[in-house]
């Protein structure tokens, strides 16, 4: 909800901060790939879960958010795809919009009704 600061918003801001820091520091696509693999551990440190049922789920969601922030597409859940796959196509000066504009990370979702927008105070923590 707008104006309410939550731990999910904090994680979101950390993801954008780290992606911006990576882009300003520059480097090759292999450097970006290595940094992308390390960022979930930097953003969600330690061994204790705080937002989800497992620390591994939290880091997987952060990893997916990093991919989306870098302009990469959402990975299919049914296939094993590396975090940095397709990165060489994203690390360019001009990158144009690829549909869809808004992505839903399915395994991060707590099963809110799809294709329905309702403003309530029943936040599911997505």
Language-model regions: role of each:
Residues 2-126:
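Ferredoxin-type iron-sulfur electron-transfer modules and their immediate structural context
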């Amino acid at each position: 909800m707008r104006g309410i600061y939550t731990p999910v918003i904090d994680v979101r801001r950390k993801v954008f901060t780290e992606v911006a820091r990576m882009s300003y520091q520059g480097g090759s696509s292999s450097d970006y790939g290595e940094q992308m693999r390390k960022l979930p551990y930097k953003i969600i440190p330690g061994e204790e879960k705080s937002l989800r049922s497992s620390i591994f789920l939290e880091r997987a969601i952060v990893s997916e958010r990093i991919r989306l922030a870098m302009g990469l597409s959402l990975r299919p859940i049914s296939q094993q795809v590396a975090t940095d796959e397709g990165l060489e196509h994203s690390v360019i000066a001009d990158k144009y919009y690829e549909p869809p504009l808004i992505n839903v990370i399915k395994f991060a979702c707590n099963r809110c009704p799809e294709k329905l927008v309702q403003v309530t105070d029943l936040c599911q923590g997505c």
